[in-house]
Amino acid sequence: MALIDVAISCLNSIREIEEDVKDAIVYIDAGCTESFQFVGAFPLFLELGARAVCSLENMTSLDAVADWNSKSDCAKRIVIMTSRLLNDAHRYMLRCLSTHEGVQRCTVFTSISEGSHSAIPDSPLGPDAYREYETLLVQDYNEHTKKSDKISKDKGVSKFSSALESLTMEPIESENVDISSGGAQGLVVSVHHFPLIICPFTPRAFVLPSQGSVAEASLSRQHEDSLSFGLPPISTGSMSDTDDVPPGATLTAHFLYQLALKMELKLEIFSLGDQSKNVGKILTDMSSVYDVARRKRSAGLLLVDRTLDLITPCCHGDSLFDRIFSSLPRAERFSSQAQLKQGVPSINRPSLDVQVPLGELLNEEPSKIRDSGLPEGIEAFLRGWDSYTSAPQNVGLFNECDKKSTTNWTELLNGSLVATECFRGTPYLEAMIDRKTKDGSVLVKKWLQEALRRENISVNVRARPGYATKPELQAMIKALSQSQSSLLKNKGIIQLGAATAAALDESQSAKWDTFSSAEMMLNVSAGDTSQGLAAQISDLINKSAVAELQAKKNEKPDSSSRGLLSFRDALLLTIVGYILAGENFPTSGSGGPFSWQEEHFLKEAIVDAVLENPSAGNLKFLNGLTEELEGRLNRLKSEETKEIPSDDQLDIDALDDDPWGKWGDEEEEEVDNSKADESYDDMQLKLDLRDRVDSLFRFLHKLSSLRTRNLPLREGSLASESSFPGEPSGNKGLVYRLITKVLSKQEIPGLEYHSSTVGRFIKSGFGRFGLGQAKPSLADQSVILVFVIGGINGIEVLEAQEAVSESGRPDINLVIGGTTLLTPDDMFELLLGQFSHF
């Protein structure tokens, strides 16, 4: 039976819309851009006959000029692909149509189904969402066209923007709407569903676009069991009514349902965690007898709440893939236009579009770069491309000085990771993500060496067998990039090699290794005593505060400070420490895992660190206090400066014993009063700070109670086994432990099976005669899809494949997915950032 390949399925879905893409300008939003970059879809669009592939958010009228298929006539068709709800992408689509006034047909593809649009609260669209939106878009286009006719042409773009901002999307009243979508002076609008807008890292591992509506939607509402808008709530067993589930759960259920339809899978649904049960129930309710009959292949779907295992994505595991995504800069995300509905915000997750620094590798010889004429060519291109939207003074980026010129143009030469790039049929990313850091980097080095042999290129570089370093990777990449033919032929391994070299850079790898060592020490201390663990956390906070303060004094940290942790980093380790403490120590009388005295020392360490450097970390729990704390610190520094007399200052009072000169009793009294007021303000400020720190620790108590409050973890068989490092699964994440138990057919506490429609019918109809259907097992399925609601990281993908390999079941086709890709920094933002519930 053929293996499932989600990346190839995405490409096949694009081929299915060839008739719409042919001879059209294709606009894709930021979420689709993330997806299509991983899939490697841009060459396919041009192969199918697209005139150009352009950004929907950054569209200009010049997009019609960039015709890659050399069409002499004007474009009459536009295709818009979006990963957002139609109402969220509306203003971009309207601007696109209004700019290309000669367009006669607009085809919209959205990854959000009609059912999702009608299921979201406060949605302006109903069950017939696509048809309604076709009419609405034509109406708003007509309205804008009428307004534009009244605007003087010499006022240009600014007037267009103001007219566009006045257009809003209101619910459609059926009696006032002309159902025809083709009544706008020949403009025909059609809306279709395109479900496979996902970001596949490998053929069997994917996440959702971070700038799409599903990933941005909230996964919990604020209540006592919730931790963050971007994470499911704690699974206490009190499953909420599905009518009140957050929008993220609803959109996730609809996405998985449509994914199964597209992949022709009949799902047997299992869930672990309260939010997963909600999603499973929605999925089951959406199923019907006809859906089951249409699907060809049986598969098991295991839904898992991220909140059941927060420590894995918080830690810095041995994964080259995770190092790359944590080290490389990301593309700037576009601001979400999703409105705050019912007190639930959209989550601004970091873009998945990593910026591979290819330009930096070519920046070593500026003189050769200048002689090649490349900067002038890029400047000429930018002048022509940006002349419509950019001021003349902003276009000549390369004429200020040679150094700045070289820096600017190299920023344009950023690469990206593509999941479909292969080496002899093996996808680069798949082979790398299935290996740990050392093995993965050595594999990348071997691929580069093989590419050099194929191109007959020799490189004089000192290499250590069994190791890969940044200098040798850079030398090989630069040699492969000397000619255009070699660069294009080997672009996949060149980009991956550059990403690996950036992750192995000392400034990045030293800090990651420091994190990893600190987490290991916390793990060891958690297996000993609470006093030792508390002392370890306190030491990390104190050292990080001192290091950051020293770096601030030096303005620029020198090389000796590389690898040192910041105060923000220490807070992330504090989260890890509290979760470990909750798993290993019983709750003390203070409500947390530590005694009152142990926790008091931790609080004092954080208070002292904040008082010494209030701006460190840009922390949510200091909102509203940071400026006051900075003012206090600056005042104390200025007073210290005044108290130190200069060497040439003459002390008159020391030369004259006659105290009559000190006549300013009133002035001294005013100074004393002022100092008393300042002292009172300082005391009040410290009290406010301690209150904030107390609220932080109440949130840490909630994190430490995850094992006791999460119902599936109470029995202990799924909980972290960090205190037994000799066990094979001792330091593995929850996904590994789940898959291991599933494939060995062990009982999993809290795992719920959601009967299909046919199963419920058989159970209710024939069950009374003793002919009820037996509960299926996930292990009996040849295809298993594990989806983590809240997100996954690279180490979990690696461990999932390890679990399958160790099970001795090569017939199992395992696919792992998640809401988004999580890094430790992402977890910090979710737990202590603006979307946290503490």
UniProtKB/Swiss-Prot annotation:
GO cellular component entries: endoplasmic reticulum membrane; vacuole
Cysteine pairs bridged by disulfides in the record: none
Top-level taxon of origin: Eukaryota
Free-text disruption phenotype from the record: Accumulation of the precursors of the two major storage proteins albumin 2S and globulin 12S in dry seeds.
Keywords: Endoplasmic reticulum, Membrane, Protein transport, Transport
Subcellular location: Endoplasmic reticulum membrane
Composition bias type Acidic residues, residue spans: 646-658
Subunit structure comment from the entry: Forms a complex with MAG2, ZW10/MIP1 and MIP2 on the endoplasmic reticulum.
Protein name, entry field: Sec1 family domain-containing protein MIP3
